[in-house]
UniProtKB/Swiss-Prot annotation:
<feature type="binding site">
    <location>
        <begin position="153"/>
        <end position="160"/>
    </location>
    <ligand>
        <name>ATP</name>
    </ligand>
</feature>
<dbReference type="Pfam" id="PF02874">
    <property type="entry name" value="ATP-synt_ab_N"/>
</dbReference>
<dbReference type="GO" id="GO:0045259">
    <property type="term" value="C:proton-transporting ATP synthase complex"/>
</dbReference>
<comment type="subunit">
    <text>F-type ATPases have 2 components, CF(1) - the catalytic core - and CF(0) - the membrane proton channel. CF(1) has five subunits: alpha(3), beta(3), gamma(1), delta(1), epsilon(1). CF(0) has three main subunits: a(1), b(2) and c(9-12). The alpha and beta chains form an alternating ring which encloses part of the gamma chain. CF(1) is attached to CF(0) by a central stalk formed by the gamma and epsilon chains, while a peripheral stalk is formed by the delta and b chains.</text>
</comment>
<dbReference type="Pfam" id="PF00006">
    <property type="entry name" value="ATP-synt_ab"/>
</dbReference>
<dbReference type="Pfam" id="PF22919">
    <property type="entry name" value="ATP-synt_VA_C"/>
</dbReference>
<dbReference type="InterPro" id="IPR027417">
    <property type="entry name" value="P-loop_NTPase"/>
</dbReference>
<dbReference type="InterPro" id="IPR000194">
    <property type="entry name" value="ATPase_F1/V1/A1_a/bsu_nucl-bd"/>
</dbReference>
<keyword id="KW-0067">ATP-binding</keyword>
<keyword id="KW-0547">Nucleotide-binding</keyword>
<comment type="function">
    <text>Produces ATP from ADP in the presence of a proton gradient across the membrane. The catalytic sites are hosted primarily by the beta subunits.</text>
</comment>
<keyword id="KW-0997">Cell inner membrane</keyword>
<dbReference type="GO" id="GO:0046933">
    <property type="term" value="F:proton-transporting ATP synthase activity, rotational mechanism"/>
</dbReference>
<dbReference type="InterPro" id="IPR005722">
    <property type="entry name" value="ATP_synth_F1_bsu"/>
</dbReference>
<keyword id="KW-1003">Cell membrane</keyword>
<dbReference type="InterPro" id="IPR055190">
    <property type="entry name" value="ATP-synt_VA_C"/>
</dbReference>
<dbReference type="GO" id="GO:0046961">
    <property type="term" value="F:proton-transporting ATPase activity, rotational mechanism"/>
</dbReference>
Length: 474
């Protein structure tokens, strides 16, 4: 990355990741990068213009070794990202520097990460479904091609597992480019994901960008824009569809909160930055479909203390076309993926887009599961026998639907010992319809647990009947 450093200033204050500098001549522009250190290894982004020729910047690298009186140079350019065919199959940091122990890619161009979203006249209004191969998502909360989907959940309910399974299912069948952006997540998870994708042979059409949790908040705050700049190149310049996976949007908001506090801005509710809505919109509005191609985004969103009224979750909800909510209660019951079928929603679940049969089945499933939730208190107090015959049938259907919507994942196969399943939409709909029609009312619930399609359930039932007939009487 080439930078022209011709204007110099002096460091006057260093407070953690915040650096104040004085420029006697021309002031550096907002968002311009300042370089300090013997080898320009300390990078600071200008965030505020103060009075008297002073600027305040946010460090994108650790500031160890920086002292008052040191020289700091204006690069004359904002943060930039490499774009081009050569970035495929590589792993980068926020500066576009490779972190996969290989030489920098050749023939790349550099673009500013601070670009405007596509104009309204450039955007596509076409709506179509994006198949994931996961039953609970495709049936009850289908994703939109060129839309934004959020995976909401607290700590330990399976957000990262679900997003890695989505990568596994979609990267192989996805004809465009897949781009994974890790914001403030564990280095170990990124390394495991890189290794899995390389072994699966899908790394050649994938780009990975990381701003890890041990990096300064400035790097975590900007790494999403670096990834988006790369995604926009493939969408606009090459006309290729892009699958953008982000883990975790909450860490982006959290990094902005840290920067806001260090800059001395007045906090808003629960300590969040007053500009949270604007900052999130700047990121989310660049994820869109145009007449050239589409960027489809799936984003993990950590929900602090499982509180869905938290401002970070509330602000994120409004940008999404599908919200997939993960439930701690379902996870504790062993119903994986722990997707809450009643809380999860999708804007495209209407008969004009998904078809009359899909819409009707999804509504019937929700109605059955909602009635079961209402009956749980009565069952706990009085027992199942006190329910009417029709209510008992609803309970039996709901329990079988809950188990059928579970699914073994390829990415957890080494832990569970169960072969992963990718289920076609028709197979998922046929299974739900059969259960709603009481086809499995006499069968044990366990044959529907952790399977793909109904053929597996029928095979299990035949095996149980064979085993039962083969037993000798006592």
């Amino acid at each position: 990355m080439k930078r022209q450093a011709d204007r110099s200033g002096t460091v006057v204050a260093v407070r953690g990741g915040i650096v104040d500098a004085r420029f006697d001549g021309e002031m550096p522009a907002l968002h311009s990068l300042l370089l300090a250190g013997a080898q320009d290894e300390i990078v600071v982004e200008v965030m505020l213009h103060l009075d008297g020729g002073h600027v305040r910047g946010n460090a994108l690298t650790p500031t160890q070794g920086l002292a008052c009186g040191d020289t700091i140079k204006d690069s004359g350019a904002p943060l930039q990202a490499p774009v081009g065919q050569a970035i495929l199959g590589r792993v980068f940091n926020v500066f576009g520097q490779p972190i996969d122990r290989r030489e920098p890619p050749d023939g790349c161009r550099w673009r500013s990460v601070l670009t405007k979203p596509a104009g309204l006249t450039e955007r596509s209004s076409k709506t179509e479904m994006f198949i994931t191969g996961i039953k609970a998502i495709d049936v009850l909360a289908p994703l939109e091609r060129g839309g934004k989907a959020g995976l909401f959940g607290g700590a330990g309910v399976g957000k990262t597992v679900l997003i890695t399974e989505l990568i596994h299912n979609m990267v192989g069948q996805h004809e465009g480019v897949s781009l994974f952006c890790g914001i403030g997540e564990r280095c170990r998870e990124g390394e495991e994901l890189f290794r899995e994708m390389r072994e699966a042979g899908v790394l050649d059409n994938t780009v990975m960008v990381f701003g890890q949790m041990n990096e300064p908040p400035g790097a975590r705050f900007r790494v999403g824009l670096t990834a988006l700049t790369m995604a926009e190149y493939f969408r606009d310049d090459q006309g290729r569809d892009v699958l953008l996976l982000i883990d975790n949007i909450f860490r982006f908001i959290q990094a902005g909160m840290e920067i806001s506090g260090l800059l001395g801005l007045m906090p808003s509710r629960l300590g969040y930055q007053p500009t949270m809505g604007t900052e999130l919109a700047e990121l989310q509005e660049r994820i869109s479909s145009t007449r050239h191609a589409a960027i489809t985004s799936i984003q993990a969103v950590y929900v602090p203390a499982d509180d869905f009224t938290d401002p970070a979750a509330v602000h994120t909800f409004s940008h999404l076309s599908a919200s997939i909510v993960l439930s701690r209660r379902r996870a504790s019951e062993g119903l994986y993926p722990a997707i809450d079928p009643l809380a999860s929603t999708s804007n495209i679940l209407n008969p004009r887009i998904v078809g009359e049969r899909h819409y009707r089945l999804a509504q019937e499933i929700r109605r059955t599961l909602a009635t079961y939730e209402e009956l749980k208190d009565i069952i706990a107090m009085l027992g199942l026998e006190e329910l009417s015959r029709e209510d008992r049938r609803i309970v039996f259907r709901a329990r079988r639907l809950e188990r059928f919507l579970t699914q073994p994942f390829h990415t957890t196969q080494q832990f569970t010992g169960m072969q992963g399943r990718t289920v076609a939409l028709d197979a998922a709909l046929n299974g739900c319809e059969a259960i709603l029609n009481d086809e499995f009312s006499e069968a044990p619930e366990k044959i529907l647990y952790m399977i793909g399609g109904l053929e597996e359930a029928r095979q299990r039932l035949r095996e149980e009947e064979t085993a039962g007939h083969g037993e000798e009487p006592p």
